[in-house]
Amino acid sequence: MRRRAALRTAVPAAGLAMALAISVTSGLSAAQAQDAAVSVRLLAFNDLHGSLEPPPGVRSQVKQADGSLVPAGGAAYLAAYVDQLRGQATHSLLYSVGDNWGSSALESAMFHDEPTVQLLNRMGVDASAIGNHELDEGYTEFRRMQTGGCHPIDGCRFGNTFEGANFPLLAANMEFDDGAPATLPFTVNYVEGIPVGVIATMPADTATMVTPEGVGGLRFTDELAAVDRTADLLDFFGVRAIALLMHKGVEPAADNGPNSCEVTSGPARDLALRASPKVDVIFTADSHQQYNCSLPDPMGNPRVMMQGASHGRIVSVVDVSIDRTTRDVLRDRASAFNQVVTHDIPSDPDIQALADDAAARASEIGAARVASLTGDLTRDETRSGESTLGNVVADAQWAAGSGHGAQMALTNPGGLREDLLRGGPDGAVTYGQTYAAQPFGNTLEVLTVTGATLKTALEQQFQPRGDGTITERILAPSSSLTYTMNRSATVGERISDIRVNGDAVVPEGTYRVAVNKFLADGGDGFDAFRVRADAVHAGCDLDAFTAYLGTNSPVTPPNTDRITVAG
């Protein structure tokens, strides 16, 4: 049985004062009056990415404190643990910290992630942050997932109807260009008449992480300002117990198990240290890491900040006590732990049936053989930032664009989601594997750029941040494109000796390059490609990848020597 708080509501600010006034006048029982605090268990998971089945590869395990690895994850086990953890508490609330779908497993993505929304509905999620991946297919598709309705092209592929999410999807810093909120910034739940608020934020640079065209008319504002503003609003209306779902995370200096805290730096940590002291608990996401920390808020009071890996491998749990008089969280009584979603308890049969149904429907397509490999194609990066998988994908896109005059191709590493591993004695790979490696379904475009523009694009692989650090995103080049990179040089002057098919690129020359639509729209900060001169479509990235593998089967992993590192 799914357990929820006595009342769940998602109300805009205009209706909040009346709702709170009603809740405050509710009488307490004698037993409640004797207990000065009410206990509430807050549960959260993050970055599920449509993982209805236990995830493959490195995402299938969790590292324990003793260094051992245990199998973990899978929607049916996640639901079973959530039920177990909720059953241990009189009152509980269940949150997701975003990236519920997008870059999803085949069994979810084949059906436009409708099975994942059904899963979340059945699990009794009370509220979810919006992650950047919820906007992979644009705001219009996000709204369909939120409110329901069949896909405008494919219809309802996982049933006759699609009802959408029955829980609020939140982002306090996503607005329309005119400043109006594009979704709810918060929601309020009630436990024995006491309001518990939850705020959510998404990355301020979301527009660079998704196809810009899909989020046209939206802006993503500063996270800290949005948190503080919304916390003040909730406090004004008498909501004193507040959780934050922050779709931003950190990379711990070391991984010493689910409940370690090797978090020493990073934007998410800085935000957690600076966020309004009115916020009592912070759940984070996006970095797919595990940690359980207590950090001081701006008033010096301890505050939980934690994350639970990804793909349903961990449930983050915080037990809080709320003072009935002040309606605020008693911080010194809070306790937190990350519960690993192991496979040594019975899975939830209802959710297992849902996962099995989706997997069975997708399996016939996913099992089709595409090609064979003589060695694995992985995302492991060399010193130059190249990988064997990235280079093959770039070669595939060059081949797809060659009919439109493409002389080279570049692809972003963020579009490579899984390694392509050979199976069986002949090294076979399936459509399901290629889909997992290239799941976004981006269209390909062939553009005309000048030599100067090409150099600018390559220089944009090194992007300065406001905190003085540099974000490095090395694009995978096709075999026809070579250049030298010097990381010790000044930003903007790190790329030299660019050659196409061995010929030196000249600034005033014109060249045809194949890129996916994400890059053509300026995604990941590659504004240079937005010129779109003489742009033509060249099919879909996944189709190009599977066709290239089939044509060149058996495929041998290429050398990673297209970028020369100097300095």
Named regions from a protein language model:
Residues 21-36:
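C-terminal region of N-terminal signal peptides and the immediate post-cleavage residues
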Residues 329-429:
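Hard-cation-handling environments
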